[in-house]
Amino acid sequence: MNRCPACGKTYGDEARFCTRDGSKLVVVADKGATRETVAGRAEPPSAVTHANLVGRVLDGRYRIERKVGEGGMSFVYLAKDIASDEQYAIKVLSAALSSDANAMARLRREASLGMRLAHPNVCHIIRLGETPDGLVYVVMPYVEGEVLSDRNNRLGTIPIADVVHYVRDIAAGLHVAHELKIVHRDLKPENVMICAGPSGTERAVVMDFGLAKERRADAELQKLTATGIILGTPEFMSPEQLRGRPLDPRTDVYSLALMTYEMLTGKLPFSGRTQQEMMIARLRSDPMPLRDAMPGLGLEAVERVLQKAMQRDPGDRYQTAPEFATALAAASKVDGEEKSRLGRFFAR
């Protein structure tokens, strides 16, 4: 039998993590149990392989329906609650990550906080569990919609009114996390879902708080991420992230500003032949002005807001995500009024 050292809840021998707070369970010896048998129960399986989980029931509750995505570090499945028929997303971590003690310690710590992220603009963690063959999984609400990166690729650029709306939603979700001392660290378009909101509106939902980060890295950068020097996605990382310095909410503000720039122009504000060159540019160069990336866009006030949000020194940026979102909305209104004024002038 295993027990949570934090809340005292007991579990069977196969469980490793508390479903309430994510704490690692400790083994409680049965009467007559030897030191060897108790120690043996605490050991993870010696050989863990990632088999197809479709059709299996996890935790006696979640039936795996189909695989909906995968990355180098995880597989994502659609699952249904066998009692309520409600849909969930289950992210199953790779065997290598599931057996990595440091990664699991970080995941347990952040999952315990992530379970408290109840907000319409956040896909929060419901529970942390483990399959009988030793694979760690995370249960989340199933959010149906279009990934922001797919939306941007499909449209090329996104209208400023929609961008302001998405940024406001993302900032609201980030702020709740930041109040709990959680920094996303890997905010990017692939981690935002655009789904149906109330009364026919759209809602942006931030995904993957506290989870293992997927990486889009070239060979040079993979050497750094493999050592744990860098945690995040290179294209959207802040300068302090690249330098390996302590992170705070202003890191997510920087990443959100890069996402905003890409939504408006279809481009990133720093260029380079490799991701490493792009990283160096972020440390040494100023971002490309919005007017150069998209001539004729006519968003001078928005450009000034983005320039501030993308400052290399965190102290020179907007200090919170809502502050950035509010400034962006106000700048968009100023630019809209200026366009209307010019339109009336040239119509004379």
List PLM regions with ranges:
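Activation segment of protein kinases
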Residues: T49, S98-A101, C195-P239, R243
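AlphaC helix of the eukaryotic protein kinase fold
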Residues: S94-R116
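Conserved short submotifs of the Hanks-type protein kinase catalytic core
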Residues: D133-V147
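AlphaC helix of the protein kinase catalytic domain
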Residues: V147-I158
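C-terminal lobe helix-coil module of Hanks-type protein kinase domains
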Residues: K80, L174, T233-S340
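Activation segment signature within eukaryotic-like protein kinase domains
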Residues: Y166-V167
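Protein kinase catalytic-loop region centered on the HRD/HxD motif
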Residues: A171-I182
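A short, aromatic-enriched beta-strand patch in the conserved N-lobe beta-sheet
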Residues: R127-G129
